[in-house]
Swiss-Prot record:
There is a cross-link at residue 356 (Glycyl lysine isopeptide (Lys-Gly) (interchain with G-Cter in SUMO1)). The gene is ZNF148. Belongs to the krueppel C2H2-type zinc-finger protein family. GO terms for cellular component: nucleus. The keyword Transcription regulation applies. PROSITE patterns: ZINC_FINGER_C2H2_1, ZINC_FINGER_C2H2_2. A zinc finger (C2H2-type) spans 171-193, 199-221, 227-249, 255-278. Residues 321-336 have a biased composition (Basic and acidic residues). Gene3D superfamilies: Classic Zinc Finger. The modification Phosphothreonine is found at residue 194. It comes from Pongo abelii. Involved in transcriptional regulation. Represses the transcription of a number of genes including gastrin, stromelysin and enolase. Binds to the G-rich box in the enhancer region of these genes. This is Zinc finger protein 148. It is found in: Nucleus.
Length: 794
């Protein structure tokens, strides 16, 4: 072995990287060139100056050879391969130096020789350093190889207990590219993708991927629990369950939360604690960090912000970081877009104009009578916005609209706001002049004229549905006007057309009003027309016909109260407003003022009403109905309204002789069935006094009273109209009813235990109507039942 080669190996192992490369280039270039006198002289001068004997150099060579042999024994095959690669790289570098010009070689060699003189101080010290430095690189390389070594070369314990090296994961899954060491592990993994479960339980047909899972499951059927707790004696199928149970006795809590450092005895409880307590907290922290600009990019920081991410594996951590970065970017973009939208579309009104949930800002239209006022808020120099008055509509209330506090002068006084009227749902009836004024103004809705007005309300209803039904019927009248006739509801005289009066009373009177509303000077209806006064709109007739057809068989109960053995009833029917008109008068007036087709329609309507009355009067089902009960006890019962709906009921007293046995009544018993009825509304509900048995004991006591009543009725009724006796009332009643739609003139009233039978009378003020004298009383017509013989009506 040449000295140059020995020196090369020595410098390679003892010197630094720069020194090794420089010394090697110097020696090789000096030996190969042979022509440069400078390098040879320098080497001779170095050897002479140091005066090193030849024997010492040989001894050093032997030491180097021994060290190289030891190094070869200690260095593994991989390290030797690395060493050979470094030598090859050095040779390539030497070839590049050989290709350099000669002048540059001298420049490179001169300073390098000086460094060699400095490094070589003593041979013994150098040998000691050589031994230490030979050991250190081997240990460092072993440590580095342990970290960088693949798991395929780690010693493991095989299934049979023998030691062996891990083979590389050559078995790759086709579905997810996962690598496995053996084909068994690969096949077990493929079962997850295919869903195949080859191991089946013989008792419950459950299937499993692995055999040990099947064996563990079979212990459930056999009841075998091989693992037992030493303290409490509980048994478990799995050993893991037993160990987890033992921690409840010992109080051991090996699992710690990495956020709050709290300890837990089970892993599932740790996961639940993290999920409930720390996940939302981490999200909030990340949002705050994004807002404050504390988070930087992954390339600059090089670490994750949350400790939870550090505990994850590297691949999962990278996936979560990518997802979180993508979500952060998307959230930042969404927030920026929202901010831009908010800036682009600023609200017209400030936040103070917002109202509670119960209110909403309704659509409004503001009339600007003056141009200066209309453009003042648009041309304001200060830039402030003054919105107009808004109409607030309460959603929960039923169509109670609040009007603006300040009204323009051009709006009619009909739309003025009165809170008390709106709260009571008062739907007022205005006069004709107010309606004419409102029709002239096209900006005002016609419904407002019906809802509010300056005149006093005739009646106000607390039932909103009834009021709205009245409003719908009023709209039929307005729709039929067609700019040719005006309809007005007035408080005044009685209408000249009785049939029209009856229909209008049925459509106007509210359902919640009692029967006492039909008194003198109550609501009267006058329908005025420019061309024809005897025509009822088709819509009103249609609604009345529909109402009769749907409610023909309806029936309402009437409550009566009795006190001190006197029959006390709350029925008070004063039908002075419903006149009686003979068929000749009705037909004559209709033929003079209306055409033949409309008269036929009215006659058909009257026939329909007559049929409805016949159905109610001849219905035998009313005989056993407990709708009328007269109780003659000494108890004082509270007076209740007799009829819940006066305008939509028909009060008809069925045969007067039909009181049941055991009754002591002052009324007359007649062999024939006399019908007595009063039509007030557009319905035909009857309230009969019915019974097939007669009381012969009470006939003698009431005969005098009935004779007196009949005689007085004949004396008063003959000067004006034809009188109908109670015994012969049925047949003459039908003939005048076919031609007229008026109510029956005769009135039946029971009040405070007294029975009043009033015949048709005359009046100076209303000579054409027989039922005006309402308040007159006749002492001879009143009678009260005997206290000793009073019984309960059937």
């Amino acid at each position: 072995m040449n000295i140059d080669d020995k020196l090369e190996g020595l410098f390679l192992k003892c010197g630094g990287i720069d020194e090794m490369q420089s010394s090697r280039t110097m020696v090789v270039m000096g030996g190969v060139s042979g022509q440069s006198t400078v390098s040879g002289e320098l080497q001779d001068s170095v050897l002479q100056d140091r005066s090193m004997p030849h024997q010492e150099i040989l001894a050093a060579d032997e030491v180097l050879q021994e060290s190289e042999m030891r190094q070869q024994d200690m260095i593994s095959h991989d390290e030797l391969m690395v060493h050979e690669e470094t030598v090859k790289n050095d040779e390539e570098q030497m070839e590049t130096h050989e290709r350099l010009p000669q002048g540059l070689q001298y420049a490179l060699n001169v300073p390098i020789s000086v460094k060699q003189e400095i490094t070589f101080t003593d041979v013994s010290e150098q040998l000691m350093r050589d031994k230490k430095q030979i050991r250190e690189p081997v240990d460092l390389q072993k440590k580095k190889k342990r970290k960088q070594r693949s798991p395929a070369k780690i010693l493991t314990i095989n299934e049979d207990g023998s030691l062996g090296l891990k083979t590389p994961k050559s078995h790759v899954c086709e579905h997810c590219n996962a690598a496995f060491r053996t084909n068994y592990h690969l096949q077990r993994h493929v079962f997850i993708h295919t869903g195949e479960k080859p191991f089946q339980c013989s008792q419950c047909d459950m299937r499993f991927i692995q055999k040990y899972l099947l064996q563990r499951h079979e212990k459930i059927h056999t009841g075998e629990k091989p693992f037992r707790c030493d303290e409490c004696g509980m048994r478990f199928i799995q050993k893991y369950h037993m160990e987890r149970h033992k921690r409840t006795h010992s109080g051991e809590k090996p699992y710690q939360c990495e956020y709050c450092l709290q300890y837990f005895s089970r892993t599932d409880r740790v996961l639940k604690h993290k999920r409930m307590c720390h996940e939302n907290h981490d999200k909030k922290l990340n949002r705050c960090a994004i807002k404050g600009g504390l988070l930087t990019s992954e390339e600059d920081s090089g670490f994750s912000t949350s400790p939870k991410d550090n505990s994850l594996p590297k691949k999962k951590r990278q996936k979560t970081e990518k997802k979180s970065s993508g979500m952060d970017k998307e959230s930042a973009l969404d927030k920026s877009d929202l901010k831009k939208d908010k800036n682009d579309y600023l609200p017209l009104y400030s936040s103070s104009t917002k109202v509670k949930d119960g209110y909403m800002v309704a659509e409004y239209a503001v009339e600007m009578p003056h141009s200066s006022v209309g453009g003042s808020h648009l041309e304001d120099a200060s830039g402030e916005i003054h919105p107009p008055k808004l109409v607030l509509k309460k959603i929960n209330s039923k169509r109670s609209l609040k009007q603006p506090l300040e009204q323009n002068q051009t709006i009619s006084p009909l739309t003025t706001y009165e809170e008390s009227k709106v709260s009571k749902y008062a739907f007022e009836l205005v006069d004709k002049q107010a309606l004419l004024d409102s029709e002239g103004n096209a900006d005002i809705d016609q419904v407002d004229n019906l809802q509010e007005g300056p005149s006093k309300p005739v009646h106000s209803s607390t039932n909103y549905d009834d009021a709205m039904q009245f409003l719908k019927k009023k709209r039929y009248l307005q729709a039929a006007s067609n700019n040719s006739r005006e309809y007005a509801l007035n408080v005044g005289t009685i209408a000249s057309q009785p049939s029209v009066t009856q229909a209008a009373v049925a459509s106007v009177i509210d359902e919640s009003t009692t029967a006492s509303i039909l008194e003198s000077q109550a609501l009267n209806v006058e329908i005025k027309s420019n061309h024809d006064k005897n025509v009822i709109p088709d819509e009103v007739l249609q609604t009345l016909l529909d109402h009769y057809s749907h409610k023909a068989n309806g029936q309402h109960e009437i409550s009566f109260s009795v006190a001190d053995t006197e029959v006390t009833s709350s029925i008070s029917i004063n039908s002075s407003e419903v006149p009686e008109v003979t068929p000749s008068e009705n037909v004559g007036s209709s033929s003079q003022a209306s055409s033949s087709d409309k008269a036929n329609m009215l006659q058909e309507y009257s026939k329909f009403l007559q049929q409805a009355l016949d159905r109610t009067s001849q219905n035998d089902a009313y005989l056993n109905s407990p709708s009328l009960n007269f109780v003659t006890d000494n108890q004082t019962l509270p007076n209740q309204p007799a009829f819940s709906s006066t305008d939509k009921q028909v009060y008809a007293t069925m045969p007067i002789n039909s009181f049941r046995s055991g009754m002591n009544s002052p009324l007359r018993t007649t062999p024939d069935k006399s019908h007595f009825g009063l039509i007030v509304g557009d319905s035909q509900h009857s309230f009969p006094f019915s019974g097939d048995e007669t009381n012969h004991a009470s006939a003698t006591s009431t005969q005098d009273f009935l004779d007196q009543v009949t005689s007085q009725k004949k004396a008063e009724a003959q000067p004006v109209h034809q009188a109908y006796q109670m015994s012969s009332f049925e047949q003459p009643f039908r003939a005048p009813y076919h031609g007229s739609r008026a109510g029956i003139a005769t009135q039946f009233s029971t009040a405070n235990g007294q029975v009043n039978l009033r015949g048709p009378g005359t009046s100076a003020e209303f000579s054409e109507f027989p039922l005006v004298n309402v308040n007159d009383s006749r002492a001879g017509m009143t009678s009260s039942p005997d206290a000793t013989t009073g019984q309960t009506f059937g």
